[in-house]
């Protein structure tokens, strides 16, 4: 099956590792699906792929390498959001597209902006220049593993962005919440594509990142995860 074979498009193994360890094909006897979970708009499949390695490190007596890989199968919005083309004068995260219908007799490359779908709840008030709430605000849920002493500040950091959204005519556009308890919502899961999260990682890594899932047709951000490593604050202190 698809989940029991290697896909070069995912680059599970870097080329120099393949060369150094003489990594071959997938060993299907040692590869398997670990779990599969379905949600209203996505399915998450976790599987293990094992590869043969004729020149594995000495400590590796199995002569194999195993990797856990997660695939997300996501339903895209039926109502496509209008595209916004990149303006190179402004910094954006973008999706590169290729136009094969160009009259220049060659393919043309262009970029579309990755952005949230923020639509005014009161269009007439919005046109008058009044601040209005969006139909669907951006909501981030805190990772349950976030230390209690930091939660207040994580929320403040997320909601500080409201001042920026107000310049675009929206109030209360971005909200940070604690995750619901099992009693409040037994089906809540950070793997559910309907929920964006702020994930705390107990790691010595001095970094943070914000990967997102976007509709490749339009650039609409469907879900986002802010990943905050424990030692990121230490990195900030160095630059003060």
Describe the function of each predicted region.
Residues 157-158, 192:
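Short secondary-structure boundary/capping segments
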Residues 144, 148-156:
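Soluble non-cytosolic domains of exported or imported proteins
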Residues 1-146, 164, 168, 173, ...:
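Auxiliary tRNA-acceptor-end handling modules of aminoacyl-tRNA synthetases
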């Amino acid at each position: 099956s698809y989940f029991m074979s290697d896909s070069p498009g995912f680059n599970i193994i870097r080329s120099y590792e393949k060369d150094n360890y003489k990594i071959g094909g997938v060993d299907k006897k040692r590869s398997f699906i670990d779990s599969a979970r379905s949600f209203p708009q996505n399915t998450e499949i976790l599987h293990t792929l094992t590869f043969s390695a004729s020149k594995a490190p000495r400590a590796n007596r199995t002569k194999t390498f195993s990797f856990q890989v997660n695939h997300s199968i996501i339903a895209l919005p039926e109502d496509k959001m209008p595209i916004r083309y990149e303006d190179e004068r402004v910094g954006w995260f973008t999706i590169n597209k290729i136009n094969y219908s160009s009259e220049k007799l060659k393919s043309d490359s262009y970029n579309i902006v990755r952005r949230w779908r923020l639509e005014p709840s009161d269009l007439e008030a919005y046109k008058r220049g009044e601040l209005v709430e969006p139909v669907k605000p951006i909501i981030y849920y805190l990772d349950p593993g976030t230390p209690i002493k930091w939660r207040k500040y994580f929320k403040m950091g997320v909601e500080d962005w409201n001042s920026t959204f107000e310049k675009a005519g929206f109030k209360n556009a971005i909200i940070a919440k604690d995750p619901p308890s099992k009693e409040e919502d037994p089906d809540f899961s950070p793997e559910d594509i309907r929920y964006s999260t702020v994930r705390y990682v107990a790691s010595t890594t001095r970094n943070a990142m914000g990967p997102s899932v976007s509709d490749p047709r339009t650039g609409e951000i469907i879900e986002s995860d802010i990943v905050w490593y424990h030692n990121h604050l230490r990195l900030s202190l160095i630059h003060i």
